[in-house]
Amino acid sequence: MDPKDESAHVWPTSADHEQSTAQVHFVPDAGTVAQIVYTDDQVRPPQQVVYTADGASYTSVDGPEHTLVYIHPVEAAQTLFTDPAQVAYVQQDATAQQVLPSIESVHGSDPLATLQNPIARLDAKEEEEEEEDEDEDTEEEEEEDAEDTDVDDWQPDPPRPFDPHDLWCEECNNAHSSVCPKHGPLHPIPNRPVLTRARASLPLVLYIDRFLGGVFSKRRIPKRTQFGPVEGPLVRGSELKDCYIHLKVSLDKGDRKDRDLHEDLWFELSDETLCNWMMFVRPAQNHLEQNLVAYQYGHHVYYTTIKNVEPKQELKVWYAASYAEFVNQKIHDISEEERKVLREQEKNWPCYECNRRFISSEQLQQHLNSHDEKLDVFTRTRGRGRGRGKRRFGPGRRPGRPPKFIRLEITSENGEKSDDGTQDLLHFPTKEQFDEAEPATLNGLDQPEQASIPIPQLPQETPPSLEQEPETHTLHLQPQQEESLVPTQTTLTADDMRRAKRIRNAALQHLFIRKSFRPFKCLQCGKAFREKDKLDQHLRFHGREGNCPLTCDLCNKGFISSASLESHMKLHSDQKTYSCIFCPESFDRLDLLKDHVAIHVNDGCFTCPTCKKRFPDFIQVKKHVRSFHSEKIYQCTECDKAFCRPDKLRLHMLRHSDRKDFLCSTCGKQFKRKDKLREHMQRMHNPEREAKKADRISRSKTFKPRITSTDYDSFTFKCRLCMMGFRRRGMLVNHLSKRHPDMKIEEVPELTLPIIKPNRDYFCQYCDKNEMSYFALSKKVALYIAFMVKYLTLQVYKSASKRKAHILKNHPGAELPPSIRKLRPAGPGEPDPMLSTHTQLTGTIATPPVCCPHCSKQYSSKTKMVQHIRKKHPEYAQLPNTIHTPLTTAVISATPAVLTTDSATGETVVTTDLLTQAMTELSQTLTTDYRTPQGDYQRIQYIPVSQSASGLQQPQHIQLQVVQVAPATSPHQSQQSTVDVGQLHDPQTYTQHAIQVQHIQVTEPAPAAPSASQVAGQPLSPSAQQVQQGLSPSHIQGSSSTQGQALQQQQNSSVQHTYLPNAWNSFRGYSAVSAGDTSHESASEIQMMTLPPGQFVITDSGVATPVTSGQVKAVTPGHYVLSESQPELEEKQASALSGAVQVQPSAHSDSLDSTGPSQQQTTQYIITTTTNGNGGSEVHITKP
């Protein structure tokens, strides 16, 4: 509301006011406050008008009760206001504030009288206003003109000098001492509150009480639990305060400041921003309430629990014995009363019948036996314990719910206890016995305390078919699938088992005895009670005629309460409240309904009319219908669920609540529902479980090998200490980390092998709709189409995530291909599920394992190892140089290719599928920009080189540590050697490891061609000349010897590298092949032999492979012959032959007879792949 409008109603304007000025008298105090008295009957919201000292501006702000006028003091005693309509005389004293309606009232009468009676003056003024006959439109125009005049008259205040206590107003471009009088207050948005360091560092198991203060426990904290260290600034002893515990710290001279060398330093625990949560722990006043002890360890102070801290118990600390002497304090002495209380607190086995507590379960069992003598019968109630007497419509628990406790065997009829410690259920008398019994005896009112209390049953209301129950019977009421008390291999004796069984039964019985044992039964309605007083109170409701104050007018039946009478009056009304769930009939009494439902029994069971489910009890089928087939009218306000009963809704509302009022006294876990706490106590803290846990801890677990020694050798990954084999690398790594944490990864040779991962191409099935069968066409056309489709049409990705992003971006709404990880094996007659993934296996990738520097875990990539460190070792995640760079290795592809060739022979290609072959053939004419870079490195430890001079010589070992695979170039370009000559060293001692290279072929020129006889008599090895002992260290290193000079003349030799198409496992069992020697017992090797016309043989068997002159003989099964003019790999089936190896020109070439100086001959390499078992064997490298 505009302040001008408000003032017009309070003090109406007049022509006299506009022509004269007005003065406002006030007391030059801290401010003048006056209450405005309204003269009309119009209802207005509360306002307050704030006037500035010079009267130039004002503002209106809503107040809580009424309108206030604030007049700020100035130096003069009077303030001149330019607008008379806004002026009033204000008088302020210590007791009252008065306001005059106008300045003219003071001129025309006694000012003092007016000030003393402002209300009368206001009434007179109101009468004068009523006499004025003015038009409403004219008044509104005058108000608007007055408002415009007020705005035009407002002038901004002169700029004020800077004062930090002034509030800046950007609209006025000036500062004010408080709220801006023109534009009103600002709209503040406060900062979000942030917890202090002390409160934010509080552990999750603790909480700080907002009202009592101190630190309390949320759950049970065991003894010998350490908290800390204490954090806070260190000050001198004179600066300490008495509101917290004083902790002194002993520091070394290097940790002290210069000024504190001879002064004691104490923790100052009063500032929450500098200390941690331990500042809130209050000191203990005596030994009884102390549960923490303070001590110094190293340079820090810690708190340790000296007893079990129960839930909702406050932590209180005092000094340790030695630390108390250091801080000049005394430890708390233990009085005799405190000793008794402590002994009582150690009794953790309470009895719920008499509130006594015991130290051990055996003492509790002995005490429970005294209660068992009084209770010769133990029954249970139906449902969840809301028992209303014995079931009337069939025995048994509701189907689908497990038994709540162990029910015992009933072997006797008289209620006596059996010898094995079990209890017997008392036999219930039949209807005839109930009629003959006396009322007092049946109610149990006159029975002695320790006598057996017979519990009669209500007269049977079911048909004869339901009451056929034998009087003497034996029940075997054991729980379903009862587990054995002890494991199969246990040290418990039979007495221990019987004692554990008695403890279990007694503990379970006394949990439910209050709900199960109801000996006092009403003869009128059959309701049972645990106490006699409850039965007497109930009997008063069964009033008789003339004995009750309330009487029914229709039948003259008496009642004690109006509620009973109101319930009885329903019998005389036409409304029938009890309806049958099986038929349309309804009844006015519940007992009539129970008699009626007996006609719906079929084979002793009740059938649900909706779902045809069968139940042995009418109460069960009634609950089933109400729960599942009735209208759900009780709607949850938090979610969309609805219920048919209000109690179910209340139970459901606990899910939306954070309150957990039921606390487990053993472990401190909290629950929202009482039944969940009860189930938790039975499942987690029963004596049987505790006995199993204690026995499991005491017994050491014996090791049993899972497999026999014969199967142990068949595994790739195995632990030699435990003689166990594993199918995967990760299983071995986990086994070593758990069983052998001190063993290093380097000591296990299996874990140094590279990790083989499949390499796949992921295609987008939506980018090419015209797919065809490439293999149905001719060979060359299929190769060409395959290449064009792969690189020019199809969208190919190296990961499923990139293909998924492509489909979501370019094909929105399209169905994503199924994940390979979630595929299930195809059934009989079903298509292969891999066809729907649109992927193709292109080979395998061998990567070295990336080891975690903080544990024994291994990963195939650095990314996964970094994720592991961040998750499992967060304390090292932020430290620099904690992640080691893995070693680079070669890519073993299923599509091998010779990367480097000589310009005279052309490039040899080894392929495994047509698609890759087409890609390779057509890529020869492309530039290097379209080729896959081959810049990986391979680590090679040992390469035995077999050389021959005049006869067969022993292999000489040369170490090639690193061989770099160079990118493939055009056949017309010159090829540089990719063997690092500097890596061949002098004879040294090396440790043998796994090899990561499969094929190396080094060619060098021969000065003269050998004759046919020489070739026939020599093995597949280099030239026998001494100058061609090619790759000895002295020659390759370029020494000054004659052999070194001869090596310098062989600058035109080329190096050839090839990937083989199989994984590492395919090279097991390879052996060396020597001429005339079939029993060569050496390490597992791969031998590569080169035939003169460019044809070479890869041997993978231990049998010699002779080649006769003029033809290529059949080799052993598994041998592969690859010709220069034959780009595909053909498997030759043959049998092994004996004899010397003879090499003759093949049918594919005639160049053997005429060899020139430029002819080259290949040096034979034998690549060892033997894995050292313990990593300790050594191979000596000697010079040739």
UniProtKB/Swiss-Prot annotation:
Its main location: nucleus. Belongs to the class V-like SAM-binding methyltransferase superfamily. The gene is Prdm10. This is PR domain zinc finger protein 10. Keywords: Activator, DNA-binding, Isopeptide bond, Metal-binding, Nucleus, Phosphoprotein, Repeat, Transcription, Transcription regulation, Ubl conjugation, Zinc, Zinc-finger. GO terms for cellular component: chromatin; nucleus. Residues 202-320 form the SET domain. The lineage of its organism: Eukaryota, Metazoa, Chordata, Craniata, Vertebrata. GO terms for biological process: methylation; positive regulation of DNA-templated transcription. Disruption phenotype: Embryonic lethality observed during the preimplantation stages. A significant down-regulation of EIF3B transcript seen in embyros and embryonic stem cells (ESCs) and ESCs exhibit severely impaired proliferation and growth failure. It comes from Mus musculus (Mouse). A zinc finger (C2H2-type) spans 349-371, 520-542, 550-572, 578-600, 606-629, 634-656, 662-685, 717-740, 850-873.
